[in-house]
Structures are given as structure tokens and as C-alpha cells.
Amino acid sequence: MEVKTFAFLQIAVIIALGLHLAPAGSNQLSGPQSSANSNDAVFCDTNCTQGTDGAWSGCRGDCFCVHVGNSTEGRCIELIGDFDYSTPGAED
């Protein structure tokens, strides 16, 4: 009986410590998911379509077309933030 009680108390203490220590992390913004490094994808006002030649049309400015699967219709979106589209080794 004493062994069961002692084991139960050990488990209770471990759970209590785990619940107490889990939220004890830093509250500073850091890492790739912080708002200081965030990027946004914004829908533009236009839709886009795929022509018979396979080219997409309908997006203006910095917007580009996104579509789902084999659909010939899509939405124009714009990516806002610090995106690096450079090709590795292109500056050699």
C-alpha cells in the first residue's frame, strides 16, 4: 500500500513540475515566426485565367496568379515582405 501511495505522489510531483515549467519560456519575439520577420500574402482585386496557350493573365502590378489543381481559373495575390527569390549561384 505504501509503495502505491509513494508512486502516486512521485507522479503527482512530476506532473506539477511539468505544468509549472512549461510556460516558463521567454516572452521576447524571436525566431522565424516572430512578427518582426513576418510576411503577408494579400489578395488582389482581380481574378486570373489560363489561356489556351497555357499562359496566365489577369494579374497586374506585383500580383501573381495562384490556382488549385488543374483549374483554369485562379486568384491574384501579392506577397508583402522581405522575400529572396535569387537563384543560388546566380551571382558567380
From Swiss-Prot:
Where are the annotated glycans? Answer: 47, 70
Organism superkingdom: Eukaryota
Q: Give the signal peptide range.
A: 1-24
Q: In its UniProt entry, what is this protein called?
A: Evasin P675
**Keyword match Secreted:** yes
Which coarse location class applies to the principal site listed for this UniProt protein?
A: secreted
Gene Ontology MF terms in the entry: C-X-C chemokine binding
Q: Does the keyword Signal apply?
A: yes
Name where it's found: Secreted
A GO cellular component annotation here is: extracellular region
Keywords of the record, alphabetical order, are: Disulfide bond, Glycoprotein, Secreted, Signal
User: Which Cys-Cys disulphide bridges does the record give?
Assistant: 44-63, 48-65, 59-76
What does the UniProt record say this protein does?
Answer: Salivary chemokine-binding protein which binds to host chemokines CXCL1, CXCL2, CXCL3, CXCL4, CXCL5, CXCL6, CXCL10, CXCL11 and CXCL13.
